[in-house]
């Protein structure tokens, strides 16, 4: 993260279907930067949280409602259709594995995001899930292969090695941009904004810690 980005490298985009912020950024990037060389990488958000000893935003009670309201507001501002699912958090593994099994194409990612965040449906709704599988020409057995599971695990290991701690995160070279709030910053970097070669930008990653909070 402390190195200048490589403007010619593809943008690795780490995401999990569990994240409403990933859904929102996916649509923003498609609309605002259709020529961006985006390389989507599905990862299990819970594994990132466990590795970095962190909590997701909806695991903090006062933050939970705010998170959903904020997402709805962002969707409204950007003209993105959004409907909260029947429950959240939920188990995203079937969605992640289905995306990998079907080649992780933009069309597949679009449809799976829409299933949850446009239509408000979940993988644990058996009838709805079967309809989705039928629509995509997929079978439950495709989600359960060793190859699919190994790919998802490898994606997570790759994300952690890159320093990814949350979703969505975009990597432009070694520079990481976390969250839908960083979309404008990401696009500026990808466009070669000189800020990302500045001494002040570099200093942000070398700032000393003055005080460490004690944890019980």
Segments predicted by a language model, with ranges:
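C-terminal cap of thioredoxin/glutaredoxin-like
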Residues: 4, 9-10, 18, 22-36, ...
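Structural alpha/beta surface segment adjacent to cysteine/selenocysteine redox centers
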Residues: 21-116, 200-216
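Short beta-strand/turn micro-motifs composed of small residues
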Residues: 15
């Amino acid at each position: 993260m402390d190195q200048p980005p490589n403007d010619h490298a593809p943008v690795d985009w780490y995401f999990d279907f569990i994240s409403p912020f990933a859904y929102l950024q996916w649509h923003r990037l498609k609309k605002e930067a259709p020529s961006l060389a985006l390389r989507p990488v599905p990862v299990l958000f819970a594994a990132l949280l466990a590795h970095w000893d962190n909590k997701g935003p909806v695991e903090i009670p006062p933050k939970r409602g705010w998170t959903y309201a904020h997402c709805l507001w962002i969707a409204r501002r950007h003209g993105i259709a959004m409907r909260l699912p029947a429950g959240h958090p939920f188990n995203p593994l079937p969605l992640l594995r289905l995306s990998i099994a079907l080649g992780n194409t933009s069309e597949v990612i679009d449809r799976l995001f829409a299933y949850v965040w446009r239509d408000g449906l979940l993988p644990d709704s058996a009838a709805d899930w079967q309809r989705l599988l039928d629509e995509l020409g997929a079978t439950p057995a495709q989600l359960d292969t060793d190859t699919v599971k190994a790919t998802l695990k490898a994606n997570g290991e790759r994300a952690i090695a890159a320093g990814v701690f949350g979703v969505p995160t975009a990597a432009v070279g070694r520079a990481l941009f976390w969250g839908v709030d960083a979309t404008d910053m990401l696009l500026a970097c990808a466009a070669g904004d000189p800020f990302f070669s500045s001494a002040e930008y570099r200093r942000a990653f070398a700032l000393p810690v003055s005080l460490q909070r004690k944890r019980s």
